[in-house]
Amino acid sequence: MQIDRRALLGGLAAAVAVPPHLFAATITDATGRTVTSPDHVARVYPAGPPAAVTLYTLAPDLLLGWVEPPGEKEREFLLPEIAARPALPRITGRGDTDLNGITSLKPDLILDIGTVTAAYSSLAARVQTQTGIPYALLDGHLDRVGATYRALGQLLGRVEAAEKLASTAENTIALIMQRSAAVPPEKRPRVYYARDNSGLQTGLGGSMISEPIEFIGARNVAADLHGAHGTATLDQIRAWDPEIIITSNKDFAASVAGNPDWAAIAAVKAGRVHLAPNLPFGWVDYPPAVNRLIGLWWLAKIFYPESFPQDIKTLTRDFYTLFYHVTPSAAQVERVLTGRD
């Protein structure tokens, strides 16, 4: 693995070389709130995992720490200095967030990325009022990745770097969407997404959990069960009879072929159960951030192989180089793609 230290050192150099007043910016975040960054942003607190991942891809030097610190296997694909940063408490709306602990870290900005709802908007406003720290909530949906990067780039004074990531994301999405849209409806597979070791927890229609699957036009068999996530029954899954099963659980992936309860389902009979890669972050649903962009390529090649001849190994290497600031070896890419670590 080659480490792109320019991503870290370049950010540090920019912070020193650019006059501080050039960093100040005011944006309208995804909730419609006006957020003004301070004159100099050097420490950013991520409210949750999507914010941490997105901030890492753009400005790793500014990341104070991780709500869910990467483990040993994940750290292999991240900048060592940043991956080793400490655990931070998640900011929630349940009243159990230690705001004094957050302010003691002296962040210049609190960043949240994800679903934009009235509850999250209220949380952002309340935390900003109580701490005096600017709090930006940006949209985490795939079709908003470019806009989110550009807004974040403005806040951080990293406009050029943000534009590179935004353009790459938008061009990738446009290409995948264009080719997916050309697939006739009758050739769009029925897909079931299994999230746990029982295979019964799934992503429901319109949720961020199942967003990548639905985004490229596959038919999520659980789409009529609206919400975030839920539990299906075996009888429901048998009735849906998915042609493809995508799973993020390695135990389920390893056991389903030998499980008689699943034997009659089309995807199992055809050997079309696919374990999603998860290093350093999940490729399909968690955390729901830009890490799912490479997952779109992976899913598209599974769903529509004739329309997507691109080499997934090359795509993986290039994505990790640009977004994670490391260039994995061929052996590392192979290990990522097996999804079994």
Where are these regions (language model features)?
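A ligand-binding cleft/hinge motif common to bilobed small-molecule-binding domains
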Residues: 116-129, 248-264
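Ligand-binding pocket segment of bilobal, Venus flytrap-like solute-binding proteins
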Residues: 223, 229-251
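Alpha-helical, coiled-coil/dimerization segments enriched in small aliphatic residues
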Residues: 202-228
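Solvent-exposed loop/turn segments at secondary-structure junctions
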Residues: 49-53, 69-72, 115-119, 141-145, ...
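Short helix-initiation/N-cap motifs at beta->coil->alpha
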Residues: 30, 88-100, 225-234
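Extracytoplasmic substrate-binding proteins
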Residues: 25-27, 34-36, 122-201, 222-224, ...
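A short, structured surface patch at a secondary-structure boundary
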Residues: 51-104, 109-118
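N-terminal export signals
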Residues: 7-24
